[in-house]
Amino acid sequence: MAQSITFTFGAVAAAGIALAAGTAAQADTWRYAFEEAMTDVQGVYAQKFKEEIEANSDHEIQLFPYGTLGESADIMEQTQDGILQFVDQSPGFTGSLIPEAQVFFVPYLLPTDQDHLARFFKESKAINDMFKPLYADQGLELLNMFPEGEVAMTTKTPVTTCSDLDEVKFRVMTNPLLVESYKAFGATPTPLPWGEVYGGLQTNVIQGQENPTFFLYSTKIYEVTDYITYAGHNNFTTAVMANKDFYDGLSAEDQQLVQNAALAAYDHTVVYQQQAADTELAKIMEAKPEMQVTVLTDEQRSCFKEAAAEVEAKFIEMTGDSGAAILKQMKADLAATAN
């Protein structure tokens, strides 16, 4: 396995010059950055992608997990600039570039059934057809999107209804629709980069945040919160992209190589993440037995579901006809893949 290179943030610009030297289409070493640790879901996908590329070609993939090359905004910029060939980034961050990608933050749009989700992401016309040109406009070739697991709220006080979030400063990604979601839920949404979240919870700058279960364990967020709440409101989604100039410059054979690797990594990762939620929650409870875990009943979820209509309207207001068309197609795709 190629070793990742760690840069100080002050050296990123200088490092970029060295990295950029290898970005031509003929490069044997391709660079791939993602937002999580090597052992997290994005890391599992990246390692399988690397394995497939290297097993079926002479190319090499160099992996850069979270923090190696900066925050999420940094790795996206480096991919658009051609310094990186591949990037895995959640629509939560790309929403500022591609407003329609915020559709994944419309509450209760995505089902909690993991098998249904896996079929949807693989077969969806909205994802596989309609999103591609939107990403291309930003210099990105969308390879695929995949689910990382049901999102859980972690807080310092119990949450069983929307009123429990009143005056709670709740960390959200820098995503306009996610801000609107937590406003509608009754919280005070507080955008923060991930690197500041643990400390923010520790010092009470914020009192809550959301993420899939595996991430709560791997980042030890359970150490600085006391309650985990599953409201069924969302499933964390991420997207794998290539620099479009790089991808377009590949031979047809190498483009197929990349597509095949992305598909193999998708299938592998979906199975992994379906198991990760249960195993990682068990690890959290072993590490902190006093952690309180609540799965909201349908009655308890009712206020959150009522707020979802307001957020959906905000999404259409933000994105216009393009967003409305994608939302309509996603609903059709979800219905088509339900069984």
From Swiss-Prot:
One Pfam family of this chain: DctP
Signal peptide: 1-20
InterPro entries attached to this UniProt entry: DctP_fam, TRAP_DctP_sf
Function description: Part of the tripartite ATP-independent periplasmic (TRAP) transport system UehABC, which imports both ectoine and 5-hydroxyectoine as nutrients, and not as osmoprotectants. UehA binds both ectoine and 5-hydroxyectoine with high specificity and affinity.
Organism lineage: Bacteria, Pseudomonadati, Pseudomonadota, Alphaproteobacteria, Rhodobacterales
Subcellular compartments: Periplasm
Other noteworthy facts: Transport is enhanced in cells that are grown in the presence of ectoine, but not by high-salinity media.
Family: Belongs to the bacterial solute-binding protein 7 family.
UniProt name for this protein: Ectoine/5-hydroxyectoine-binding periplasmic protein UehA
Record keywords, A-Z: Disulfide bond, Periplasm, Signal, Transport
Cross-referenced CDD domains: PBP2_TRAP_UehA_TeaA
Annotated L-ectoine binding sites: 36, 171, 211, 215, 236
Disulphide linkage map: 162-303
GO cellular component: periplasmic space
One annotated GO biological process: transmembrane transport
Subunit structure of this chain's protein: Monomer. The complex comprises the extracytoplasmic solute receptor protein UehA, and the two transmembrane proteins UehB and UehC.
Gene: uehA
Keyword Transmembrane helix found: no
